[in-house]
From Swiss-Prot:
Its cofactor is [4Fe-4S] cluster. It comes from Shewanella denitrificans (strain OS217 / ATCC BAA-1090 / DSM 15013). [4Fe-4S] cluster 2 binds at C265, C268, C282. Keywords: 4Fe-4S, GTP-binding, Iron, Iron-sulfur, Lyase, Metal-binding, Molybdenum cofactor biosynthesis, Nucleotide-binding, S-adenosyl-L-methionine. SMART domains: Elp3. The gene is moaA. GO terms for molecular function: 4 iron, 4 sulfur cluster binding; cyclic pyranopterin monophosphate synthase activity; GTP 3',8'-cyclase activity; GTP binding; metal ion binding; S-adenosyl-L-methionine binding. This is GTP 3',8-cyclase. It catalyses: GTP + AH2 + S-adenosyl-L-methionine = (8S)-3',8-cyclo-7,8-dihydroguanosine 5'-triphosphate + 5'-deoxyadenosine + L-methionine + A + H(+). Binds 2 [4Fe-4S] clusters. Binds 1 [4Fe-4S] cluster coordinated with 3 cysteines and an exchangeable S-adenosyl-L-methionine and 1 [4Fe-4S] cluster coordinated with 3 cysteines and the GTP-derived substrate. Pathway: Cofactor biosynthesis; molybdopterin biosynthesis. One of its GO terms (biological process) is Mo-molybdopterin cofactor biosynthetic process. PROSITE patterns: RADICAL_SAM. [4Fe-4S] cluster 1 binds at C34, C38, C41.
């Protein structure tokens, strides 16, 4: 059992675990709610879990202040669907104005993007990931349960026009559903300056049968890209475990997130906080650690920072997905993926 470091004596300059990994990147979920019904995430739609409220604006401010003092440079605002929060734009502004935070990003299903891209950018958002699992409108509907393909694509155009530093498209690899879409995606990014991210399907507590039916190894896509002349790019400190590829004939780039590949966790650089204030050292840990009790007053910040540093002592070297251990993650919307 690790003893908590003494307040006032712990080195608060950098979040670092026992394996030498430094954590520059916070993924902050602000809601579990989502208006899409993606088959790999919320096939039955969003169902509220209990009465515990989501983090308030003041709690988020204190949380970001503590993380930023401990080396966090990038914050990604996630959900659920983060734009469902009425104060979403205020949260963007809060993150953007937090000292030491260099990059504010979000991941969205894109249904509000066309109308709000410029306002979000003006508030301080600089990077955006849009979930588009298929470029076939019929398959898009089959996967998401929403007939909003054209609306989401207009949102991507609006994001590019608004001046975002980077626009990424997230597509979960699904055998038998979108697994034949690679040529269509490649054709699209030939003249589109976006980063296309193929994400290998991960097993969750409520999705074991779905995983067995639709899991497609990302290594298959990687091998095809290499055969087609795509080159592996040098990793950036904030990239984490993603493998990024570029090709001289394409404006867009491709990223692969392959959690089942050997050494995936070696370059882990992120921590997660759920919408209800639980710290998760890994997407697939057994338990979250409550932080909300230390987000009530600024005077609690030293104790909050000490708790964060203490908990990193419990972070394991790697997840246990290969053993079918998915931890507390019943579905990806619960923590933000």
């Amino acid at each position: 059992m690790h003893s908590p470091p003494a307040l006032g004596k712990v080195n608060m300059s950098q979040l670092q675990d026992n394996f030498g990994r430094r954590f520059h990147y916070l993924r902050l979920s602000i809601t579990d709610a989502c208006n899409f019904k993606c088959t790999y995430c919320l096939p039955d739609g969003y169902q509220s879990q209990g009465n515990s409220p989501f983090l308030s604006l003041s709690e988020i401010e204190l949380l970001l202040g503590a993380f930023s003092q401990m080396g966090t440079q990038k914050v990604r605002i996630t959900g659920g669907e983060p734009s469902l929060r009425k104060d979403f734009i205020d949260i963007i502004g809060l993150a953007a104005n937090t000292p030491n935070i260099k990059t504010v990003a979000t991941t969205t299903n894109g249904y509000r993007l066309a109308k709000n891209a410029q306002a979000w950018y003006d508030a301080g958002l600089r990077r955006i990931n849009v979930s588009i699992d298929s470029l076939d409108p019929k398959m898009f509907y089959q996967i998401t349960g929403e007939n909003r393909f054209d609306q989401v694509m207009r949102g991507v155009d609006a994001a590019l026009e608004s001046g975002f530093e980077r626009v990424k498209i997230n597509a979960v690899l699904l055998k038998g559903l979108n697994s034949q879409d690679l040529p269509r995606f490649l054709h699209w990014i030939k003249h589109m300056p976006v980063d296309l991210r193929f994400i290998e399907l991960m097993e969750t507590g409520l999705g074991r049968e779905y995983f067995k039916a639709h899991h497609l190894a990302g290594t298959q896509v990687k091998q095809q890209l290499i055969r087609d002349g795509w080159q592996l790019d040098k990793a950036d400190i904030l990239d984490g475990p993603a493998q990024n590829f570029s090709h001289s004939d394409y404006q867009g780039r491709i990223g692969l997130i392959m959690p089942y590949e050997k050494n995936f966790c070696v370059s882990c650089n992120r921590l997660r906080v759920s919408a209800k204030g639980q710290l998760h050292l890994c997407l697939f840990t057994e338990n979250g650690v409550n932080l909300k009790d230390l987000l009530q007053d600024k005077s609690q910040t030293p104790e909050l920072m000490a708790r964060l540093q203490q908990q990193l002592g419990f972070k394991t070297a790697a997840h246990s997905l290969h053993q079918g251990i998915t931890g507390v993650t019943t579905h990806l919307a619960s923590i933000g993926g």
